[in-house]
Amino acid sequence: LEGEQVFENNSLISEKYYDKNGKITKEYRFNKLRNGILKKYYKDTEKMSSTSTVMVNREKVDGVEKMSFIFDGETKVFREDGTLMAILQYKDGSLQDLTQKFYYPNGKIQYYIVAASDDMKDFKVKDRIITYYENGKVKQDCNQQNNGSWLCKNYDENGKFLDEEIRGAEPISNGDTKFWENILNQVLEVLAN
């Protein structure tokens, strides 16, 4: 069995796809507006790799109907061990101006950011960045100022306020363009499979 489709009143409401060993690889569930949930699974384990709210785009190419998905809403990305890696927010396929969260392997939040663009090679953040310790306590809470600098409040591992500082560069990456690329590549690799 490679796949199965479920119809209701001549309308497709769900699809499931399987690998050669019969393990589920993808499934979609639609509502009548053609929006739905896309779930993907790691190969051979049937552990969920991601779940996404999507808009479905159907078009005919050379007489064959092709279906594609546009991320629109929340996407959760999981590591192979089942722990949450990231929660991404999309609007019409774009991350721009929306909050994004990245998690430690222990399940605690690591970064809370607002995406400034969709460019993954030169990813930038804006407005607010919060970094956390592995215990879940806030490490640094930064707000972007009108002049582009960042006002950051620093805390110790117990949550006690330490100091406040003004940073010229974006506080997490300190201008290192590869920093966000490395984090995002892990997430994008899971979503691509």
Model segments located where?
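Glycine/tyrosine- and acidic-biased, solvent-exposed loop/turn segments at the edges of beta-strands
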Residues: 1-193
